[in-house]
Amino acid sequence: MVRTKADCAGSSSGSYRKAVAARAPRKTFGSSSSGSNHDTSPTGKKSECKYAGGNPVCVRPIPTWQKGIGDFFGSPSTSQPEKENRIPSDDEEAGGSGAGKKPRKSRPLPPDPSEEAADSGDE
């Protein structure tokens, strides 16, 4: 049998080194002695990120039919309450999935001719 480095991993005589994950270097904004001036730019205005969002290469106009993100994340007080969270009215059943369906009247099943023949044959 041939021994490999994987076989010798448990022994201390092999020249096996455990893989260690490396860390990426941290970005430093200015010098470490800058103090509390790191939150504002030298001009006094709040600096904006160069790539704040969207496509920086080809800026395209937003179509008129596109909804804003506020429509999706609006506060619940401005939007209508959801159907699951409101109390059902008198004409609407709780848990019913059919909106506008008329309730069906229950009626007995018509007698099955094969059962009648079996019942009369036994007597």
Swiss-Prot record:
Official protein name in the record: PCNA-associated factor
GO MF terms, alphabetically ordered: chromatin binding
Keywords, comma-separated and alphabetical: Cytoplasm, DNA damage, DNA repair, Nucleus
Region of interest called Disordered, as start-end residue ranges on this chain: 1-123
GO cellular component: nucleus; perinuclear region of cytoplasm
Pfam families the record matches: PAF (PF15715)
Binding partners and assembly: Interacts with pcna.
Motif (KEN box) on chain: 83-85
